[in-house]
């Protein structure tokens, strides 16, 4: 006599099943630790082991399934029709109105969905941003709006980030610089320049209008998620996706700074190939970096953390940045249909 389920399919939610941000499966396992966002721990010295430092090796040694914090299982005794969804990203750590998710099913169909009724408008902004990028001469991953979800074409090509990291592994400095040059050209392609005095950094009181810092081109409209991770590369052409955020009067070099910042933060080993400061210097960002970092922290906090919680934690530790954050929240709401 046999017992048990004859068919099973495992899912692996990260960081765990209670508040998942990424959900992998037997057919789609992580290639790196980018999906790993551990819970906030006030005092890391209390940890027996820092999971964030272990996951890269766990993945490389093909033991992710064994060490996953949680798993979900589909079970069946008479059906093999399981594993409909192969991978999902859930932006459930954001404010409610920005919570969207992306799924890839076994037919390789990609769907972007609102995680609640409040975030339907944000999904519509993503769609509109993509269409406007086409008007600037940029290529996008084909997509269409179907009811409350976006359907996108699956592209089995490497992302620009994967190609950049390959260049770091092979120590191809010229290729690294060439790819970042291409990125900056794409960021500025078809964009209308705004007046220098309209710089968002002045409007948010991050810097003063009479500042001697040269911020480069100020774009009247900018898509700040034009990062290497958000585009596929095919035959030398870039195809953009997941362009959720549009802001006005943004220095083009701020978006390039974001690309460099995230790449080096998530892949610290690349600094041994080409130092971060050298790349920052190549694009004359060194004098802008402090202002860009302030804007980045403010933007991130306005999206991910509820402003009351943010202020209560006194994250920045000074009243000046609290005032700046309030300015950004008001500014950002206006640009997205708020009061």
Predicted segments, located by residue:
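Short alpha-helix
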Residues: 1-12
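A C-terminal cap/extension of S-adenosyl-L-methionine-dependent methyltransferases
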Residues: 12-91, 326, 330-333, 337
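Short, solvent-exposed loop/turn segments at secondary-structure junctions
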Residues: 13-18, 78-80, 116-118, 146-149, ...
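ATP-binding glycine-rich loop module of kinase domains
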Residues: 91-131
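Conserved structural core of kinase catalytic domains
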Residues: 140-207
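Helical subdomain adjoining the active site within ATP-dependent kinase catalytic cores
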Residues: 204, 250-338
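Catalytic activation segment of kinase domains across protein kinase-like and atypical kinase folds
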Residues: 204-272
